[in-house]
Amino acid sequence: MNDANQNFGLGQIGQIGITVTNLERSIAFYRDTLGMKFLFQVPNLAFFDCAGIRLMLGLPEANGEAFRPILYFRVDNIQQAADALSQRGIVFETKPAMIARLEKHDLWLAGFRDPDRNVIELMSEVPRESK
């Protein structure tokens, strides 16, 4: 495999995001009908576990537009992965940044688009040292 075909440390898909029109109804459907494990909810978003891949349900944007599905790829080091992709011509719309402090880790994201304008995010869950 030559250097041009390396995947820059992209891991498994860590999360897929889809738009829903009624969050409570969708939570009930995915949890009660499909049997997915409900993880947590924040304003306008709900998260489920689907065999180790997180499913994010989100309400449409404030302007009423649905967002396209989003692929989130796990990476060990988000800055190194972003730097490697930038060297390949990727222009990041959102630079690596911590977006959530969860119970045991900090969630970092960085986003760009594919040629069809689909959103792709790098995600890194950085453990916090316990005190």
For the regions a language model picked out, list residue spans one by one.
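N-terminal beta-strand motif that seeds the catalytic metal site of vicinal oxygen chelate
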Residues: M1-E24, R54, P69-L71, V126-K131
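Vicinal oxygen chelate
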Residues: M1-G9, Q12-T21, A46, G64-K131, ...
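Amphipathic alpha-helical segments
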Residues: N22-M36
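Short linear motifs in intrinsically disordered
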Residues: L34-L39, Y72, M98-L102
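Conserved short beta-strand elements that form part of the metal-binding/catalytic scaffold
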Residues: K37-P69, V119-E125
